[in-house]
Amino acid sequence: MNIFIVVLLCLTGVAIAEQCGRQAGGKLCPNNLCCSQWGWCGSTDEYCSPDHNCQSNCKDSGEGVGGGSASNVLATYHLYNSQDHGWDLNAASAYCSTWDANKPYSWRSKYGWTAFCGPVGAHGQSSCGKCLSVTNTGTGAKTTVRIVDQCSNGGLDLDVNVFRQLDTDGKGYERGHITVNYQFVDCGDSFNPLFSVMKSSVIN
């Protein structure tokens, strides 16, 4: 009987150590293991495939654009109302204003804004200005947003206008949140002089 209890306690300890994702407060798996939809760490397709609702360190992590992806993440909304403030990061008291407030208007207004504290990706200053492709898992509505702030909900805190754009069935507004998948994507901010020259010669 004592051996059974010891084995049971050992198995329970191992299981608890492997919990991750929203079931464990946004915790990531050790050793870059994937976090399954059920909140357990592993390395097979059952854990790592977005088709199986992998939560973090998923196989299509998109590391090439510097951040990764996560599934089934909580997204709330925040009243930045950036268009009412001239897309001014200082007026919105956004965390990233320290580094990005002097970016051109075209850069600041290119995408809707979000605060970021998701389970996968850099946080703090290194996340500022990066872009996410965000998909509402309930409706399939999709948009690209720019990170301008930090949050504490373990996911995203979208500008209310972006939230409305994704909340096409209105259920998110009723609940106060939507469930989303996000992936870091290239913002397309790079200036390519060759492209600009080619574009102007085509116009002329």
From Swiss-Prot:
Task: Enumerate the spans annotated as Chitin-binding type-1 domain.
Answer: 18-60
Q: Quick check: keyword Oxidoreductase in the entry?
A: no
**Propeptide, chain numbering:** 61-66
Q: Report the leader peptide range.
A: 1-17
Could you list this entry's UniProt keywords, alphabetically sorted. Allergen, Chitin-binding, Disulfide bond, Signal
- PANTHER family linked to this entry: HEVEIN-LIKE PREPROPROTEIN (PTHR46351:SF7), WOUND-INDUCED PROTEIN WIN2 (PTHR46351)
Q: What is this protein called?
A: Pro-hevein
